[in-house]
């Protein structure tokens, strides 16, 4: 008995495999904030995939999805990049940059620079998600990232590039919120 199936209501044919379902879930979570399993189930159904609550709960667990607070203090689901069933490297450059922009808009509270360092603040529990998105975007100006619970440190390649990097990330976040 299959717990997920393609819809017959004229929607697109959707593969019924667990991997295809996981890809669809990750895609949705990376594109928009999702606050509940019922909202995610509806979004999946809108995309031609009907899933039981039990299957969805199991899928989210397998993907390592957790709820984090965005900048509006709302709990949303997030999936760490390394939890994606397909490699994040398979995403195009624009998709990686879009994910970074979206997460910056949702999670970045502040950015301060000193020389080649940038300190970013996020809601509790969100720093590693934003750091992962920044790492995946592979921005040339960033030498590396270090993330704690609610704070990230970025190291600029340029000895004086911290302020430009902080300004760039703040602009990305503001543009996403607009």
Curated annotation (Swiss-Prot):
Please report which protein family the annotation says this sequence is part of.
Answer: Belongs to the ArgR family.
The entry's protein name is: Arginine repressor
Q: What organism is the protein native to?
A: Streptomyces clavuligerus
Q: Which residues form a coiled coil?
A: none
Which keywords describe this protein according to UniProt? Amino-acid biosynthesis, Arginine biosynthesis, Cytoplasm, DNA-binding, Repressor, Transcription, Transcription regulation
To which pathway does this protein belong?
Answer: Amino-acid biosynthesis; L-arginine biosynthesis [regulation]
A Gene Ontology CC term for this entry?
Answer: cytoplasm
Check the record and name the Gene3D superfamilies matching this protein.
Answer: 3.30.1360.40, Winged helix-like DNA-binding domain superfamily/Winged helix DNA-binding domain (1.10.10.10)
Major subcellular location class:
cytoplasm
- What are this entry's molecular-function GO terms? arginine binding; DNA binding; DNA-binding transcription factor activity
Q: Which Pfam families match?
A: Arg_repressor, Arg_repressor_C
User: Biological process (GO) annotations?
Assistant: L-arginine biosynthetic process; protein complex oligomerization; regulation of arginine biosynthetic process
Q: What role does it play?
A: Regulates arginine biosynthesis genes.
Keyword presence, Cell inner membrane: no
Q: Where in the cell is it found?
A: Cytoplasm
């Amino acid at each position: 008995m299959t717990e997920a199936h393609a819809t017959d209501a004229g929607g697109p044919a959707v593969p019924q495999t667990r991997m295809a379902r996981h890809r669809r879930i990750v895609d949705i979570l990376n594109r928009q904030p999702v606050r509940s399993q019922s909202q995610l189930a509806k979004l999946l159904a809108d995309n031609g995939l009907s899933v039981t609550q039990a299957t969805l709960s199991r899928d989210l667990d397998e993907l390592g999805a957790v709820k984090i607070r965005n900048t509006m203090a709302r709990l949303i689901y997030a999936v760490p990049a390394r939890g994606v069933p397909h490699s994040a490297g398979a995403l195009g450059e624009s998709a990686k940059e879009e994910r970074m922009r979206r997460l910056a808009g949702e999670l970045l509270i502040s950015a301060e620079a000193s020389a080649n360092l940038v300190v970013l603040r996020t809601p509790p529990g969100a720093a590693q998600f934003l750091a992962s998105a920044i790492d995946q975007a592979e921005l040339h100006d960033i030498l590396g990232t270090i993330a704690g619970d609610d704070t990230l440190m970025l190291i600029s390649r340029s000895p004086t590039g911290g302020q430009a990097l902080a300004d760039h990330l703040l602009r990305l976040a503001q543009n996403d919120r607009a």
